[in-house]
Regions:
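Sec-dependent signal peptide recognition
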Residues: 2-8
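Short beta-strand edge/turn micro-motifs at domain boundaries
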Residues: 19-21, 135-162
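Short, low-complexity N-terminal intrinsically disordered segments enriched in polar/charged residues
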Residues: 18-58
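Hydrophobic h-region of N-terminal signal peptides that target proteins for export
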Residues: 10-18
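Surface-exposed, charged secondary-structure patches
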Residues: 64, 80-130
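A mature extracytoplasmic/lumenal domain signature
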Residues: 59, 69, 120-124, 140, ...
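Short, solvent-exposed secondary-structure junction/capping segments
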Residues: 38-45, 56-73, 90
Length: 162
């Protein structure tokens, strides 16, 4: 009689073991990679002030950005990536007074040696209207260069549902 209950209990627990982990890799590297998301949102947020140079400090000189919200337009090299942030992206537009935030369940990072991936969704909150200005995703491929993590490739775009 105990055996069917044990099997049932085991079956009920299996989904918990099957769910993918949000992070994988050495803890110190995960922390460093996740700090990129913090720097990203600090740079694009109006409080204390928007900081394009801080945003660009995240990117390698040969970084490639793909804007999935605009027909997969590609920006190659750090100067073109800067152009994207100045001319296309919402956070750096002068009329937008946004604060960026990523809910904990919407960030994932994986580190293997000197390579990493980082995915997060951004809720850009408009401080003037107290409403969501944009809901976007960022998917990055990172490389450790001289001890620092830099963005090599990134895809950005809109998220349709919260």
């Amino acid at each position: 009689m105990k055996r069917p209950f044990m099997i049932l209990a085991l079956l009920l627990c299996l989904p918990a073991f099957a769910e993918p982990q949000s992070d994988s890799g050495p803890a110190a590297d995960i922390l460093a990679v996740r700090n990129i998301e913090i720097t990203f949102h600090t740079a694009g947020s109006v409080l204390p002030s928007k900081d394009l140079d801080l945003m660009m400090s995240l990117y390698a000189d040969d970084a490639v950005l793909t804007d999935t919200a605009h027909d997969n337009k590609v920006y190659r090299g750090k100067e073109q990536v800067r152009t994207y942030w100045v001319d296309v992206s919402g956070p750096f537009r002068p009329e937008h007074h946004w604060i960026g935030y990523t809910p904990a369940m919407r960030i994932k990072s994986h580190v293997t040696g000197n390579s990493a991936t980082l995915y997060f969704e951004c809720l850009w909150m408009d401080v003037d209207s107290n409403a969501i200005g944009a809901h976007a995703f960022t998917s990055m491929d990172l490389a450790r260069v001289d001890g620092h993590w830099l963005v090599k490739r990134v895809k950005v775009g809109k998220v349709d549902k919260l």
